[in-house]
């Protein structure tokens, strides 16, 4: 029996077991560049920017006549997931750190592709009532996970390259973040799972950086967006940060009489990235 390849397209990344082969310690810039290039070559290969017929696997190049059979070609990773949103931001940062434009070129090429095909998948969805779930995540986001990380990365490259045709995608994402995401009474981003009015530390990164980056995109409202980003950060930190540990709890339930502190490493990583943003 053929062994199933486990990847982000068929298994949630947070359920995968690590298989570290590298060693920890001081690294030279040359070693870092070598590792970054190794990872970059892999993710570039595993994230094709093509539309295919899901029944035949054949590439579709004329988007104007495609129907519900159309989907993004499946690689190991999804082009519009929150995991890939933070990967896009990492690649932008890699260009800034190394001067190697290939990393940002990758981000721009994937965003140009998504901007080109999104209207056609939207047409299919409106006509047929269904389309590729990976595009529905872009067209009709239902959670910060669907919108925030990719939106923040899009803004970062859009403010540097005005020719990048992602305004419609950015505005659709941000409309959800600003106007449709569930919030506590004081405006803090929240969820209704696993309990009513629950804060997830993850949502610091899934929401706040996009708001902060919008201050660069819409300079007329710069101060409003910066104030909102700071307000969100402080309201999360007030409930989630544990001073004696120097860490954040992963969850906070408004109706709870006590607030246990489970400090998940991955979620604390989201909080630290948010602080950097």
Residue spans for each PLM region:
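Low-complexity, Ser/Thr/Pro/Gly-enriched N-terminal "stalk/linker" regions
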Residues: 2-129, 164-180, 184-185
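Well-ordered alpha-helical segments within folded domains of soluble proteins
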Residues: 9-20, 79-96, 133-158, 199-216, ...
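Residue-level preference for long, well-ordered alpha-helices that form the structural scaffold
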Residues: 28, 32, 83, 103, ...
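Extracytoplasmic/secreted proteins, especially bacterial periplasmic and envelope-associated proteins
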Residues: 34-38, 86, 102, 106-109, ...
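Carbohydrate-binding/catalytic loop surfaces
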Residues: 56-76, 125-157, 187-203, 245-267
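Alpha-solenoid helical repeat scaffolds
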Residues: 97, 117, 160, 217-220
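Mid-sequence acidic-hydrophobic segments that form the walls
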Residues: 157-160, 173-184, 213-217, 236-239
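Extended ligand-binding clefts on enzyme/binding-domain cores
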Residues: 198-277
